[in-house]
Amino acid sequence: FTEEIVNLLLHSASEDFDWSDISPTIFGAVFESTLNPETRRSGGMHYTSIENIHKVIDPLFLDELREELEQIKAVKVGKIRTDKAKAYQEKLAGLTFLDPACGSGNFLTETYISLRKLENEAIKLKFGEQIAIDTGDIIKVSIGQFYGIEINDFAVTVAKTALWIAESQMMKETEDIVHASLDFLPLKSYANITEGNALRMDWNEVVPKEKLNYIMGNPPFVGARYMNKEQKDDLLSVFTDWKNAGNLDFVCCWYKKAADFMQNTNIRTALVSTNSVSQGESVANLWKPLFESGTHIDFAHRTFRWDSEANMKAHVHCVIIGFSVAPNNKEKVIYTSDRAQKARNINAYL
């Protein structure tokens, strides 16, 4: 950027704009809208709306956390309720998340905001209408719990910025609850976004698997026939010695990497992908070996039309699949539009 352009952006164009209330998720839409259609198509980049993010994170973990909070609120005895709120806050602070195709960070940012809102509810239970005297350690949840991998260097910067904005905004909400100013230095906290090719990296070097609770995201949408040579090579490096791997869509790589990473852990995963992963050859080529290795589907959103908040929306149909390797006694759920159906088992056709 020339000095003239920088001055135009920072001063003339932004002179009357209040940045304090900007939605961090808007950054994702801005980033995607700067890409030309060919770049977006070849990279399979599609921004995820808040609504679609919650289709992933709500059944993966957020619904359960909300239910637990409501149970704490219902406790009649003040001391017991306060103690449970403290323990709940520590639980939130102990959760760790990975988005291995994080793009501009919308999954991580929205998850951080959702956790901080729950934490603020717990803080309300602890302090009531009192003014906090000791504000040194009120907030436990941090952006350091959120890890991402992204191949595009500019998207990495956008993701870090979005997390910092979210951190600042949620800090203000906490200050309103405790009626006190909290020490906060923006950009001081560390955002764990790693620039690199997630399909060639050892995810354990990004975040140790014994520390991780959840994997989530919206990996690139690139059909088997549309992959470039580099993407094809990446796919074959993930599906070593698999039959008919060349017929799989690019997104299948993240299913395989996640399934491998979850072995011998309690990690749970949920991914958005084109509905091709639950149709035709993918059922035999992807899911049969995954099921044989111990993977099972915990919940699924059947085919829905993709909508995002960016211009030039992706014209695709998607599914969301939650899966894990560890034993899971919870009821399995299939979502169709706004209807939820319980199931004993969910197969690859959903």
How would you describe each model-predicted region?
Residues 186, 193-194:
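AMP-binding/adenylate-forming catalytic domain of the ANL superfamily
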Residues 51-52, 109, 116, 156, ...:
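Signature of N6-adenine DNA methyltransferases within the class I
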Residues 44-45, 130, 134, 207, ...:
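Pocket-edge positions in alpha/beta enzyme catalytic cores
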Residues 68-93, 115-144, 167-188:
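Flexible phosphate/Mg2+-sensing switch loops adjacent to catalytic phosphate-binding sites
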Residues 10-13, 29, 79-80, 127-131, ...:
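Short amphipathic alpha-helical surface micro-motifs
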Residues 1-114, 145, 149-158, 162, ...:
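Preference for the N-terminal adenyl/adenosyl cofactor-binding alpha/beta module
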